[in-house]
Regions:
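Rossmann-like NAD(P) dinucleotide-binding subdomain of oxidoreductase/dehydrogenase enzymes
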Residues: 1-127
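ALDH superfamily catalytic-core signature
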Residues: 52, 67, 89-186
Length: 186
């Protein structure tokens, strides 16, 4: 059994990612749903069951935020749990790592990193600028894989910076549900 823990801020893609590899390798999975979006995580399991995956292959546990520490401890300590996959904050990741270490369980942590983009001198500047802007501002930058550092070859740095400034000035912030606004207001 693999325990997967996915966050709220990209619930479909990150829960699917927590399930895909363990399932492809023939494992069953217990997905600890985020307390902020349990219905989304449960829906993924229901879709997989409807698609013929089989009863008990993907199991979803929902809980309140106050119960999270006890649920995590029990999932990790369970004798059938062989590995843990966690995507989320560095703070909670440290707790997961400590708990997994206590039970000698391997753990994969995908935490709030410093996701870099490297732009080489042969890059198409328009494409690079669009990729950096998307990576930095998609989901208002509130995802673990948001672009946080940009390393640009000295030969094109000035041009890149100029184009990135132009791009950021053109991005409108508003409610994404009310139009084509890639940057929502918090």
């Amino acid at each position: 059994v693999i325990v997967g823990m996915a966050p709220w801020n990209a619930p479909v893609i990150l829960a699917t990612r927590a399930l895909a590899m363990p399932l492809a390798c023939g494992n069953t999975v217990v997905l600890k749903a985020s307390e902020a979006c349990p219905a989304t995580h449960r829906l993924i399991a229901e879709i997989l069951l409807e698609a013929g995956l089989g009863e008990g292959v993907v199991n979803v546990i929902t809980h309140s935020a106050t119960d999270a520490p006890q649920i995590v401890e029990r999932l990790i300590s369970h004798p059938l749990t062989k590995r843990i996959n966690f995507t989320g904050s560095t703070h909670v990741g440290k707790i997961i790592a400590e708990t997994a270490a206590k039970y000698l369980k391997p753990v994969l942590l995908e935490l709030g990193g410093k996701a870099p983009v490297v732009v080489l001198d042969k890059a198409n500047l328009e494409d690079a600028v669009n990729a950096v802007a998307f990576g930095a501002f998609f989901n208002q930058g509130q995802i673990c894989m948001s672009t946080e550092r940009v390393l640009v070859d000295d030969q094109i740095a000035d041009q890149f910076i100029e184009k990135l400034i132009e791009k950021t000035k053109s991005i409108q912030a508003a409610n994404p549900l009310q139009g084509n606004y890639p940057l929502g207001v918090l």
